[in-house]
């Protein structure tokens, strides 16, 4: 699904975005917001609130809660925030074509959200692109987070954990040197067995033996089976919510 969303976002940017008015100071494009990654809970609204609380405004949101008219103004943004791997191609297009820098990461947790805010401000002031979720120190090597690459890497950065991207666009820009892109169940089972704590969608629990399993549902994996159990981790105490 990510490849399809990536192509859709990129073509929307190419077809509808036009340079016009001046850049809007501290305005942000949110790119990569899909119901499969951010479900129907409050995460996207929380990202918007977090941006406002940190001195930013929302220019557009690709593609939840924004009209095509709003998305067409994306070149006027000061920076783009890429919250899933399917948004990277369109963010690069906006940077190459209109000079809008981008930052990659989801503001999960308290510590990582502060870093992400600082990186957004740096991107605006210096005009540079930053992979925030790929810049992390693995302090809890016994813990591994599985999921969509940008979200899982962001959560891994908050927790100091390793990341295994089990769904996503194979992109070295997102994953850090300690992260892994994995598509095979047997390989995943082996990886999980090498760690004490595994954070993943509940449908992965049958192949997680001998480790503490922390359920973090993801609609792209388990559909609507666990919708009510999907937490909003934006700018919150992740360890408390996940009972780590």
Residue spans of the language-model regions?
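An N-terminal assembly and electron-transfer interface module characteristic of large anaerobic redox
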Residues: 1-244
């Amino acid at each position: 699904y990510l490849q399809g969303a990536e192509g859709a976002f990129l073509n929307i940017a190419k077809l509808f975005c036009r340079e016009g008015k001046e850049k809007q100071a501290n305005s942000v494009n949110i790119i990569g917001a899909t119901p499969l990654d951010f479900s129907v809970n409050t995460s996207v609204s929380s990202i918007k609130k977090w941006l406002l609380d940190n001195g930013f405004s929302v220019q557009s949101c690709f593609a939840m809660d924004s009209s095509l008219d709003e998305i067409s103004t994306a070149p006027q943004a000061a920076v783009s925030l890429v919250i899933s791997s399917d948004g990277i191609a369109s963010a690069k297009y906006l940077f190459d074509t209109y000079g809008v820098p981008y930052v990659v990461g989801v503001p999960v947790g308290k510590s990582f959200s502060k870093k992400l805010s600082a990186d957004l401000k740096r991107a605006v002031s210096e005009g540079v692109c930053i992979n925030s979720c790929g810049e992390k120190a693995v302090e809890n090597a016994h813990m591994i987070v599985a999921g969509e690459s940008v979200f899982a890497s962001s959560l891994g950065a908050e927790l100091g954990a390793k990341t295994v991207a089990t769904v996503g666009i194979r992109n070295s820009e997102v994953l850090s040197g300690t992260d892994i892109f994995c598509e095979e169940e047997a390989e995943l089972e082996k990886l999980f067995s090498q760690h004490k704590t595994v954070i993943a969608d509940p449908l992965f629990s049958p192949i997680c033996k001998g480790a503490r399993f922390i359920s973090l549902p993801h609609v792209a994996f388990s559909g609507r089976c666990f919708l009510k159990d999907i937490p909003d981790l934006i700018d919150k105490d992740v360890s408390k919510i996940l009972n780590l």
